[in-house]
Structures are given as C-alpha cells and as structure tokens.
Amino acid sequence: MNSIEFPLFERTAQNSVISTTSNDLSNWSRLSSLWPLLYGTSCCFIEFASLIGSRFDFDRYGLVPRSSPRQADLILTAGTVTMKMAPSLVRLYEQMPEPKYVIAMGACTITGGMFSTDSYSTVRGVDKLIPVDVYLPGCPPKPEAVIDAITKLRKRVSRETYEDRIGSQQENRCFTTNHKFHVGRSTHTGNYDQGLLYQSPYKPSEIFFRYKSSVSSHELVN
C-alpha cells in the first residue's frame, strides 16, 4: 500500500553516479514529508483523529499535523462547510505555500451531504471554493480509507511536473451564496471577494413568507 514506483539503487556500488532531474528530486523529497493542516468541522474529523493512535500510526507516512497554514502543504477538509466558514477556508488555503494539496474527506465536504438539499447556508462541495486533489467519499470514511487517499496523493506527487503546479495556481473560481459559480479574480492570490458570501439575515424568512402567502387557503385544507 505504501509503495511508490521509484528506482532502487545498489548500496554495494561505491563508485556509482546517480542522474536525475530537479523535478524528480523535488517530488521524491516531498513524498514522506506531507504536513497536513487539519480542518475539521463535523464528525468525519473523529475518524481522522483515530489515525494518531498506535493502531494505524500515520507517522510512518511522514505526516506531521501543523496548526499554522504557513507550515502546511496539505489541507484535509472534514465535515460540512457553511457559507460563514467559506471565507476562512479560502484564506487558510491562500496562506499555504506552494505546492499545496487538498483532500476532501466525507460526503458533506464533497457534495454538502444531507444538509445540501434544503439548506441555504451549506456549500455544496468544497471544490466550489478551493481545488481538490483527492476525493474521499463516505459517511464517515474509515481510517483505512484515509490512508488509501494519502497513498494516492503521494503517487500523484511522484508524477507531478512543474507545469502542473503552475496550472493549478491560475484557476479563477469561487462560489456565491446562490450556489452559482463566479468567474473573476483568482481566489488564490488574496483578492477573494468577501462580498460574494454576504447574505442578508432576513432573506430566508422573506422568501418563506412570500411563498406562504402565494399558497391559497383551500390548498392547505386536507
């Protein structure tokens, strides 16, 4: 499960020459040094916390949880993301140094889950805010699934090129309170338009009473 396709070198050869590229050397050095920023807002985060114990021992993958986004290169989102928390999540992502990666953990993070059907304040997928590298479905995903997602991410890092990193930094997208895409300034440069996430606290009730008044009285009689 933890194997990455890289050539093994002969330890007995004393006068050997190793040739590689700077891109491959950079990828190899980052394989076992992913430092995640834990962003847990719901019950899925409890499953990730089980990896800290001795049974799964996620330290063997080089994962060192960080409390500051400036020291992390991986953010693991677990749980429901609301419109109120969306600016904070985007800002944390912006403060992470390049290259950086995102793992979306759980159904609520990927699609909004059961809260996305009738909730006006739930983001229907964290990929509407930040680019996601690995999707981890489940409600909640098991610790073994988290390990599998990290393994797949490490395999992607091993095949990454410099052009892929530049392309991921040029995406311009964000998500409004009406659950619509907005194409404008890049959300990864600190110029995120906070006004797109503003919603009047009286708007939901106004819509409700407007709908209630439009329904005739005979339709409410059984």
Swiss-Prot record:
Keywords: 4Fe-4S, Chloroplast, Iron, Iron-sulfur, Membrane, Metal-binding, NAD, NADP, Plastid, Plastoquinone, Quinone, Thylakoid, Translocase, Transport. The keyword Glycosyltransferase does not apply. GO terms for biological process: aerobic respiration; electron transport coupled proton transport; photosynthesis, light reaction. [4Fe-4S] cluster binds at C43, C44, C108, C139. Its EC number is 7.1.1.-. Its main location: plastid. Coiled coil: none annotated. PANTHER family: NADH DEHYDROGENASE (PTHR11995), NADH DEHYDROGENASE [UBIQUINONE] IRON-SULFUR PROTEIN 7, MITOCHONDRIAL (PTHR11995:SF14). NDH shuttles electrons from NAD(P)H:plastoquinone, via FMN and iron-sulfur (Fe-S) centers, to quinones in the photosynthetic chain and possibly in a chloroplast respiratory chain. The immediate electron acceptor for the enzyme in this species is believed to be plastoquinone. Couples the redox reaction to proton translocation, and thus conserves the redox energy in a proton gradient. This is NAD(P)H-quinone oxidoreductase subunit K, chloroplastic. It comes from Chloranthus spicatus.
